Amino acid sequence: VVPHDGLCLLSVHAHPDDESSKGASTVARYHAEGVRTILVCCTGGEAGDILNPAMDTPEVRADIGAVRVAELKAATDIIGYDETVMLGYRDSGMPGTEANERPDSFAQAPLDEAVERLVRVIRRERPQVILTYPDEQTEYPHPDHLRVHEISIVAFDAAGDADRFPDAGPAFAPSKLYYSVWPAERFRQIHAKFLELGMESPFSEERMSRLTRDDPFTTSIDISGFDDVRGRALKAHATQVDPNSPFWFGLPPEVLKEIHPLDLFRLAKSRVGPVDVTEDDLFAGLR
């Protein structure tokens, strides 16, 4: 791999496994091109349920935090992240749970404190491009996912302002901020393909009826040659992903590749041009 001089891509995610389900193949592609790739994982995933029956043992439950960090290391090695930074918060769980009320949870952290931690990473790593979550998350409104959006938006602006968080390093203004999106149309295509192949779809008709909003996107990244990365990285999260799950692995790889040849993103903020663009490169306008 020949490093691209100075190009850096930073992804902000809520929990271990989010980096695998969202944009993993894109990160793998840019890493292979020589772009420096940085993951910021905001929590340790301590409140997550064990979703793979084979991993649901007393030993794993007793040490779930350490297990999930080890899974994260395995997944990031598969994807090709050059560095992983843990932001240091505890998984907030869902509203109304004990985990959500803990003072060390991400959801309870003062916004400025969490933003400063992210700003510190941005100023140190100097990424031109940041990937994060959209503001619209009705399909899975986890408090930590919502908070990832909040801190990313503020940190994108604050990192370049020398008057904000002056102790967090020399100011650096990233150029572009993207949302990782998964339009409802893609869910509909996957659901239809299950039915076409005579297979039971993991998506209920009730759930499909709720998928009414199609996230707009500006940027389509060709993941040819890297389309298997997402599945391999997901399987590294053995507590969270059942390798027999029809949701993740029900369709044959060649069929999924046909439906999902591109990772999709929406340009939300840009210092190098308008955001209403059509692109096939996250670094468009930067090289």
Predicted regions and their residues:
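Active-site rim/loop-helix segments in enzyme catalytic domains that contact anionic ligands
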Residues: V1-E125, E254, R266-K269, P274-D276, ...
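Metal-dependent de-N-acetylase/amidase catalytic core
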Residues: V1-V12, T97-R287
